[in-house]
Amino acid sequence: MRYSLLFFIFLPCVITAVDLIHLHDGSPLFGEEVLSQTGKPLTRFLGIPFAEPPIGNLRFRKPKPKQPWRIPFNATTPPNSCIQSEDTYFGDFYGSTMWNPNTKLSEDCLYLNVYVPGKVDPNKKLAVMIWVYGGGFWSGTSTLDVYDGRILTVEENVILVAMNYRVSIFGFLYMNRSEAPGNMGMWDQLLAMKWVHKNIDLFGGDTSRITLFGESAGAASVSIHMLSQKSAPYFHRAIIQSGSATSPWAIEPRDVALARAVILYNAMKCGNMSLISPDYDRILDCFQRADADALRENEWAPVREFGDFPWVPVVDGDFLLENAQTSLKQGNFKKTQLLAGSNRDESIYFLTYQLPDIFPVADFFSKSEFIKDRQTWIKGVKDLLPRQILKCQLTLAAVLHEYEPQDLPISAQNWLNAMDKMLGDYHFTCSVNEMALAHTKHGGDTFYYYFTHRATQQTWPEWMGVLHGYEINFIFGEPFNQKRFNYTDEERELSNRFMRYWANFAKTGDPNKNEDGSFTQDIWPKYNSVSMEYMNMTVESSYPGQNRIGHGPRRKECAFWKAYLPNLMAAVADVGDPYLVWKQQMDKWQNEYITDWQYHFEQYKRYQTYRQSDSETCGG
């Protein structure tokens, strides 16, 4: 009781500055009035709890809604970040550390932040945008500087919400039981969405205009919510940036998830268990007793190949009833308005981590040429492609043929771009295209963008191009933070277009249509299955006006990944091993023996021509 009395004695000035808000369950809280980096006022609430802390026996379980509280909650402190690994590969280089969590790591991390333009007015009913961060489902937090919601909120007059959700094993361990049902991170997101749907009207939000938007694993999460019947009532529109439920890293089958638990159990020295007859009770007991840091330190043990994240959503029969491709084919998803897109150089960022022999850290910032010949390129490709492609010479040859540079001379940058496009198409762009195309074919309105501008404030080397994730800076208005960054006027104009398109979409379902009924200067056409028109998001001097409208993008290459290659793999699987042995022998005969015979025959012909020419000359 003394604590309650002291609380009200020492906090009246804060409470009068920002009035208390009582949630619909009666829980009181207050935030703070702050200024955006552009000098405009807003009200910010940080670290509002939406779930009970998932600690103790709640570790690995679905989240439980936060119980009501009586004492006013001080929502002015950034929340904990969920337990996760940090990127130390490039030391203290800002380009990598900017994605590391910037608040205390804890299992007690299920909180959300709310940004409201001006003062809270429950009668305004503004459109609401819920941000879902990326990070491969193994990292990420709502509090990163690049996700600072102040500029987007005040410049576009929207309410922005950003929630934390559990990542890695804490968010996605699947054991086929209530103590570890899988998809806990997705249930965290859904509980936050329910909180917003229930309470955002008290902050001035319109519960009939709630838009989910996310990037990478956040985009995959958003599209998974589109597939889940559990999520459908709690949002109305969706934006996916460089990720989809059909991305090869986004969802895994149950048997794979269970096998990964066994591998981690053995890696943690809990015992030595066979994959054939595992004891899941013993595995779960080990994980529940383990220190959080021990789990984090061993979380990558099950990973065997590039683009394979250890703990991701699973088709659990509850949150997800079927795989994403089946849902898209049959139209089992929320048909609404969808804004989707990808970046020009999606995978280069990841290649540098995966191929240290090709991209040594010691030379990373001083060199610009790393892949100088076909042999190095093929070696890198083989280190990056999934096993199901590598195990057959036919499928590997098809991929190499599709992406190998042909125009001579071939530069180091050509080889690098070919590798980037191969992996970027496979892991990101083509899956976003697949989602956009399915949504359109089943009657949903879709708008597609392609981000092609390399920012002047980009800290990564110039040869890396337009990286995965770096459209986020423009969407959240970073170029207008002129006290910290030195973007150009053109880049501020580009950021303004990004913010306006995204906010218009949240408000009206159409990036072109302003809330007052007027339209933007440049018209962004709807995406369709025939012309596949998209908006090239870049600075004005690169593609002025309607010249920014393109078709595709990457249409031919995505047809290769989504149609030709799967059909080839199916055909190869049907013919059986004897045919494959014969085919490999035939390939060797054609590529080695015949080539060798042809070489000697050509040499013989040249010799005969030379003799004839020499004879004619001598006899003349």
From Swiss-Prot:
User: Which enzyme type, at the first EC level?
Assistant: hydrolase
Q: Does the keyword Membrane apply?
A: yes
Q: Which CDD domains match?
A: Esterase_lipase
Active site, UniProt feature: S216, E346, H468
For biological process, the GO terms are:
acetylcholine catabolic process; choline metabolic process; regulation of locomotion
InterPro entries, per the entry: AB_hydrolase_fold (IPR029058), AChE-related_enzymes (IPR050654), CarbesteraseB (IPR002018), Carboxylesterase_B_AS (IPR019826), Carboxylesterase_B_CS (IPR019819), Cholinesterase (IPR000997)
Tell me its EC number(s), please: 3.1.1.7
- Tell me what reaction this enzyme catalyses: acetylcholine + H2O = choline + acetate + H(+)
GO cellular component terms, alphabetically, are: extracellular space; plasma membrane; synapse
Is Cell wall biogenesis/degradation given among the entry's keywords?
no
The secretion signal range is 1-31
Q: Which UniProt key words apply to this protein?
A: Cell membrane, Disulfide bond, Glycoprotein, Hydrolase, Membrane, Neurotransmitter degradation, Secreted, Serine esterase, Signal, Synapse
* General function of this protein: Rapidly hydrolyzes choline released into the synapse.
UniProt subunit comment = Oligomer composed of disulfide-linked homodimers.
Q: Which protein are we looking at?
A: Acetylcholinesterase 1
Q: Which gene encodes it?
A: ace-1
